Amino acid sequence: MKFVIESLTKNSGRLGRLHIKDGAPGQRTPLLMQTTKGGSIPYLSADVFESHVTETPQLLELTLSTIDHMSEALAQFNSADRGLSDYIGFPGHLNVLLLRDPCETTPAGGNDRDIQPLFTRRGKESLSPKRYMEMVASLRPDIYQGLCDADTNAESAKKRVQKSVDRTEKFMHYIYEHKSKVDSTLLAPIVGGYNTFARTQSIKHALEQPSGSYGGYVFEGFHTNGLSATILDASKLLPIVEHCVGQLEEEKPRMVPGAYTPLTTLELIGLGMDLFDTSYAYCAAVNFKALTFTFVQDEVVHVPFLDITDDAIKEDFSPLLKNCVCLSCQKHTRAYVHHLYKTNELLGPILLMVHNLHHYMAFFEAIRESIARDGLPQLTELVRRQNGDSQVDYSIAPNRKVISKATMGKGFAAAAV
């Protein structure tokens, strides 16, 4: 894997191009990885994704917690001309393997001296460094993260944070020794919660490795995934990230998985982060929210979401977002998507995912354009206030509205309870 920085500014982060393997097209950074569950884009088939969201090859974010059951079959499927992306139905796309699903809250606890817990659909699995490398060898991803203990957040005690660093170092010692058996690029995990000393210790362990031991960094341990990433305090997060970035070399990409809000994402990019994922778009969709925040300068005050459970839109025949060119907005209306919610139709989350992914990918294109002209601070301020007088709240609250079976199929006639 090769990472080339094309533009670096003090106020606007950096533009780069990531070349993951020979023969594959380069990926422009800041890059938005496509989050998957069980090897699939949530709610979307490969055909729908490639025909109605984007035809451009993407970097797929796969998680071991949702595809661990595939390792045995993939050991027989993989060959010189077939890989993990081919197996899941996305030939031509690149992939990165992470441990935890950024879309769902990772349970706390279950940590042991010599194993890392992996929470799957079948329950908790015990993952030793040896077993992890065997699974990576079977799955053969293009990129994979090192095994780490990321069971920390802003409330974690100092003892728990230190244990996460010590256990990660122990795991990574084995990974570094045996990585030559895997023909994939390794990402070195940087853990340590919100403790600058612990983060520095984690960074030093990575920097002590021989040149070429890994191709980039993945920052873990800031949150427990799922909606927790949308509500974290950026005033605590950003100083820690800035502290870490100052100790890292420029020529390696930096990944921060999780459902960070658009505003926090922009602030992280300003500090030098490169790779993000679409888990925020997914979390919004499964909680019945269409993304409507603007990243194009105008004079109109905008809101971050459209709540499609709101009865106020049941007769609103405008698109989810004005001037959006996605399939959902071109072919359907707010009233129709609200009707799909009330009748519990599967097409509802499909249309929301199509719109949210399209909108978030356009957002990242706008980010790259703004960095190219050194305009990231202006874009950040627009996203922060949306032309209003105060900062917009991008956190996502879980939708707790329930539609009873008695009201299903009655469309606009019955209200959710």
Swiss-Prot record:
Its cofactor is Zn(2+). Zn(2+) binds at C324, C326, C329, H355. InterPro entries: QTRTD1, Queuine_tRNA-ribosyltrfase, TGT-like_sf, tRNA_ribo_trans-like. GO terms for cellular component: cytoplasm. It comes from the Eukaryota. One of its GO terms (molecular function) is metal ion binding. It holds the Pfam family TGT. Keywords: Cytoplasm, Metal-binding, tRNA processing, Zinc. It is found in: Cytoplasm. Transmembrane segments: none annotated. Its main location: cytoplasm. Non-catalytic subunit of the queuine tRNA-ribosyltransferase (TGT) that catalyzes the base-exchange of a guanine (G) residue with queuine (Q) at position 34 (anticodon wobble position) in tRNAs with GU(N) anticodons (tRNA-Asp, -Asn, -His and -Tyr), resulting in the hypermodified nucleoside queuosine (7-(((4,5-cis-dihydroxy-2-cyclopenten-1-yl)amino)methyl)-7-deazaguanosine). PANTHER family: QUEUINE TRNA-RIBOSYLTRANSFERASE ACCESSORY SUBUNIT 2. Heterodimer of a catalytic subunit and an accessory subunit. This is Queuine tRNA-ribosyltransferase accessory subunit 2.
